[in-house]
């Protein structure tokens, strides 16, 4: 049996609703799935309800938080087994949502200066189309990218990011981020475990430097590291597994599925280059239960 501990829905920048994502996981034969939308837990209750209805599909409530890290790399931190009703999580989500809301109009304004005629109203409409029923609308760059496609400014979402919205794009603006320690503490305060997501995106070709970064994050309270990911080749996977053992981090893995926004990434399979065995989940769950027990003793 296989699992997927890194996926996204329409609650952030995925294209499947939380309900449809659970159905896709069931159809793919997965035994467990985590929903880890960017900076929000809005889709978790819907996903949990559908997973329970389907049966034989363990649901892990999660989140993915962007943390401050020097360019050109990026640091994302996954939270697993978080409490969707946590006040700490809600405060953090509100803070990051406000940061997104401040950035999005600047991006649209810059795009108009570059000749791409789209409006925030169009972007908001696209975000509403894709949001789960009753959930707060979280607007992100994928919604702006979709507006660019609909306005015939670009042919594809990928082209929108390459030309305008990615970190080297002409309309890119950085957003406010938590420090790594703040992100880890927020996840812990929400009852979850913190994991380094896709470590290759830290963008360091120096294994010694990568080890130093991972060590610092472990010392800051990190619980795990994503060993299996669609961006990891065999060499990277082996290196991350080695680092997990060296710094006593629980190895995790997932496809980073986004639906049609990443059409080459398949749920549970990545780019057909990964299978995360179900045996990965029990150690993560055991540490979560141990932490909960410690908190209540």
Predicted regions, residues:
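An N-terminally biased module of ancient metal coordination in phosphate/nucleic-acid-related enzymes
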Residues: 1-72, 165-166, 184-185, 190-262
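Generic low-complexity, intrinsically disordered sequence content enriched
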Residues: 26, 115, 243-247, 271, ...
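Conserved, well-ordered active-site substructure
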Residues: 265-277
